[in-house]
Each structure stands twice: as structure tokens, then as C-alpha cells.
Amino acid sequence: MKRIAAFTLYCLLIFPNIAQADNVIEFDDLLYAPDDSLRSKQLSGVEVMGEREWRENGIINCIPTKSERRLSNSPASLIKTMHLTYLKEKDGAIVNLMGEVVPVFINGKRASQIDLETFWPKEVKRVQYLEHPADPRYEGASAVVNFIMPEYKVGGVTRVNLFQRFPNNGYYTAASKLVRNNWTYGLMVRGNYERDHLTSQTGKTEYRDFFYKNQKYETLTRTENRHGYSRENGVQTAWNARYVTDKTTISHDLSFGWNENPGSGSLSQDVWSDNLFDASHATERHTAKSLSPQIYGLYYFKFSDKWFLSNSWKYAYAENTTSAFSQIGKNTPILNGTNEKVNSLKIVVMPSFIPSKKWFFQLYTTASLDWFSTCYTGSANLRQKQARQDVTASFKMGWYPNDDFGLTLEPGMAASFWKIGQEKQHTVIPTMNASASWSPSKKVYLRGRLGLYMRPASPSESNPVLLQNSELMWSLGNPNLKNLTSWDTYIYSSYLVTKWLSLSYGLGYVKTKNEIITTYRPASFEQGGLVKELVNPLHSEDRVMANISIDGSFFNDNLSVSISPEWSFVHVQGARYDKFHHVTFSGSIDYKLKDVEMGISYKGPYKDIDESGMRKTWRQGAWGASITYGNGNLYLSFQAENIFSKRNKRWEQFTSPYYSSRFDFREKGRAFTVNLTYTFGYGKKVDRSIDISGPSDAKTSVLHGE
């Protein structure tokens, strides 16, 4: 920690000595209005934060440079190249200072999968960041990033993206859309695959106080050296038709998804204590397929300047099949299979009332209904039916007396109902979210948030089917699980020290009750072995997180440096009482030279403790390097991941009364990626704000094994 503090102090002292002249932005890039015309209003009510950033009507605006647009091929990569204080790129997503993923909007319309696949950074005129926006087009989101792009009447845009990692996975996407007057039509096709034959693990497992074949075992140890392999293929398509006027939006999507695991598994070399199994190896194999057509409708109506209505619905059907094989030596194999059909329906209704610029009111209601019918074969021969309904309702009130201060309050309720066979359960709990924002000066921004979060048990977690996964292990869900609840508190701030240096700070506290954790207990005398099941612990878990981000831009904004130390503390009082501290560090350096950008990055090691203190994990840090070329239409990026480690290392340790394990994993480490994107437009004008949803992940109630 002392080294991090010293390094931070050094950065603060040395940066002023190497700062260079201000960046020059072309006149054509300045202050575009939403319709892409130049602003004619005066700067009254506009708070300038930096040379290309300003706050107006509670919205933070930023203009990307020409170089930043060219060296990007997605919303997240554009945010990364812009090096903003209040938004960051993380694992291909955009996150705010609290670490929350921020949804992407384009010209005030939510960007779905096809929007992202046809996103053209070259056309971005302005980036806006809004928190708790009153505009009902933002669907009641707590924070959004909105990209202002030109809207045209007639034309189209086509984008092709090829991503390949060596070794050994890739995805390939082609998307296009056509605009004619008020109508927009879109089409997307995407394929992906993955092959991993490089994962291995070594370690030891202890089973305690169990029966097996009429004999009681106090302790049994298995030492293993396992080599695993995994494979996956997938295809997704989406079609869209949308009609838009100033007061109405009507959009319908049809999508289709197919995924398969053609065969994955592992082969291990084992040593058993007491020579329980006359075998030196074990084999596991499994396959899976999922097929899911989906249809989605979105509607927006503006009745007046004060009354609005947004609603949507989505229906999805899925067929999921799985098979599993487990064998120790020449023992009788353990076989399992499932054939599942799923029907899902979700409805969202959000009326809004905006009486003035200072006040807004939103009623947000959702209803989700899922029906599962699953046929189990193998260790469990039965057909199970499960029905679930989740209903939420909240009333959001916002008060913004001026651009520098705002308050929101959102009380609500969440109810869950489910029926599994003849067993019924339900829960109803209150929810609450509150936030406050304050900008004491043009360089300082403060925000705080308090929320009561609820998550019901998933269909697979509440599944009461008992499955035998291996010779000594069974799995069992729990239909009596309580809803996970947590109090989340965050305070964060951003500070623009100078035009070339900015700081951001974050502090969070989360208290979790009824966490859903994994435990083990002895199986019955007839079954033998152990049963892995899910329970709610008696005690809570407390987490405290703090982070600092230092961002600097030098040499006419061509050199960018980012430094981010993080600290976390976990206090668990569940099955195992424990306290845990962890400090890590990440950073990056990027240099732009006309249409080329070169960069190096470092992501520090990671430690965590969860499962009520029973599970501890560690992962090593990694260095990366990249070089990117872009000219507006063509984007080409080469990256080297984990450049100093041929294999990525991590370990996992689990400790409980009846089952304990410790494994060291060696996974895919050093890898090289190529990302090629080509985008072109045609016709007079192009509208890139189409809302098309690709197929989301298919739901399943199937109980997960080991």
C-alpha cells in the first residue's frame, strides 16, 4: 500500500512538468444539437468542465476527437479511447464509478444488439452521460450513456466484424439496416465458436463422515491431476421493423438463437486413500443444445409535454437438451440426461408525469412469467413441471432544483411466486432506492446512492430434483430458499484537477443477507457419498470497497496514462467466521500517432472470499499490449493478452465440515487476437438508432451438477 501511495504522489508531482499545449478541436466538432445542427443558444446555463466537456441541464456532454472516433469500433472502445473521468471500459462494457454496467442509448433510444453491431464511431458527434434522467425514453434507468449521431431520412449502413483469438475462439458478425422516411428495417447474423484444450488442474479433495457400499468412512482423500477440454458453437440472427414519429415509436423484433456444446469433459489421473476404487483414472463428458426463437415489442407514446407512456413485451420459447457421463475406472458409468421446454413472457409498463423541469414521477411495473417442463433420464427418471412469476413495482420521484443538485427516491415492492410439482412458495418484500448528486463547482462532482436489492432463487437453484453426478456426489436444489437481499451504499466523486489531469474516487458498502451458498452433507445410507445442496446462511456478509483512478493526457492528448489502485474488505459471519483484505492495482498507457494507437495495460492479481467464508479464490495479474489502426471505415486491432504467462494461474479452496478441496488451475494464458471491422453507409442519410434485440440467453430450470 505504501508503494501505491508513493507512486500516486509521484504522479501528482511530475505530471505538471510534462503537460503540453491544449488540444485543438475543429470548429465543425463543436457543440452539436441533437439534430446535428450547430447550437445557436448562448452559453447561459452551461457549465464548462474542460476544453471539450460541459454540463447543461444536468447532462454531462463530451465531444470525441477525430482520432478517437477513428480508433474505435464500438461504444465501449470509444469510451476507452476518450479517457473520461466518469465512465470507463471494463471487459467490453461501459461502467460508471460505482462499477455498474451503464446501458447504451443512441439519440435517446436504447441500443440493442443490432445497434451495437452497426455502431459507427466515425459518426458520433457527442457523448452524453445522464444519471436518473427524467426523459421516459431512458426507461427509468439509473444511469445511461447516450451517443448523439446524425439521423437521416433515406439510406442504410452495413457493418462486418471479424474477431479471432489464437488459441482458439472467434465470432463473426454481419449487420445491416435500411431507413426510408419513418420506417427502419434491420438484419443481423452472428456466428461464434470456442475450443479449449489447454485447461488443467491439480489438487486434493477430502470427503468426511459418509457411507459408501455399506461402510462408514471418516476421511477419504482423492489426489488428482485433471486435463479438461471444452467446445462451443453458436448462431444468432435478428430481424427488426420500426416506425417512428415525434410522438410515437412502434418497434417489433424477431430473433433466433442456436447454441451447442458438441462435447466437453475431462480426464484425470487419481490416487485414492484406502484404495477405495481400484482405478487410477476418471472420465467425464457432457453435451448440450439450446434452440430459442424470441419476439419482442416496444412502444412509446407522448400524449403531451407532461404525460408519457413506455411499455414493452417479450416472449421466448426454448428447447434445451443435455447429457452427462461420469465414470471412475471401470465402475458402472453414471448417466444423466434432460430434455426441457421453456416458455417465458415479460411485460413492462412505465407511465411518466413531468410537471416541470424540476420534478418528474415514474411508475415502473414488470411482470415475468416462466413455465418449465423437464424430462430427466438416468439417475433421476421423472418429469418435472415448474411455474414461476416475478412481479415488481416502484414509484420514482425526482427533484432537480438546479443543474448542480438533485434528489431521487424510489420505493417499491418485489414479489415472487413459484410452483414446483405440488409445492408452492411465495415471497413479498419492500425495495428502496435513493440517490443524491451535487456539483459544488465546475470541476467537482459528488454522488451518493442507497438501495435495497432483492434477488429470488433461480429456477435451477430451487429445483428439488436429486441427481447423482459421480460415484460419491449428488446434487439437490432447494425450493425453500429465501430471496437474497442486500443494502448497497455508494459514494463517489470526480475531480478535474487541470485540463490534463483528473481524479475519481469511490467508496462502497454492501451488506448481504440470505446469500445463496453451496453446502455438503452425508447422503443416505442407501445412496452413499455426499449431497451438494443450496441453503441460506444464518448470518450476513459485509463488504467495503474503495478505489481511486488517476487519468492524465499529455503531448496534445496523444499520450494517455491511467492508474487505478483498489482496496476491498470482506467480513463474513456465516459457516466460517473470517475477515479478508485485498489491495490490487491496474493501469494503462496509450499513445496515438495519427491513425495508429499503441498501448500497454496491466490488470493486477485478484483475491476474494465468498460462500459464507467457505470458498477462497486467487487469480494472477496479467500484462497486455495492443496496436490499432483506424481510418473511420476500416478498424484493425492486434492484441497480445497475458504476454508474460503461457498459462494463466489461479487457485480455489473450499472448506466445509463434510467436504474440502484445494485446486491449482492452469488455463489459457498468452493469446493473440485480431479484430477487423469494416463499416460503410449508402444513400442520402443514415439512421443508426434502430432498436433490434438479438436473442438473449435461453432460460433453464435444470439443476446444475458439479
Regions found by a protein language model. Name each.
Residues 1-24, 43, 248-250, 307, ...:
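Bacterial Sec-dependent N-terminal signal peptides
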Residues 23-68, 89-92, 131, 136, ...:
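Short, acidic, small-residue-rich periplasmic hinge/interaction motif at the N-terminus
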Residues 43, 54-56, 102-105, 151-157:
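Short, charged/polar, Gly/Pro-enriched secondary-structure boundary elements
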Residues 45-49, 72-78, 93-95, 114, ...:
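N-terminal periplasmic accessory domains that precede
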Residues 75, 83, 108-134, 176:
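Short acidic/polar hinge/loop motifs at secondary-structure boundaries
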Residues 76-109:
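Extracytoplasmic beta-strand/coil segments of soluble accessory domains associated
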Residues 131-133, 139-142, 149-172, 180-497, ...:
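Primarily recognizes Gram-negative and organellar outer-membrane beta-barrels
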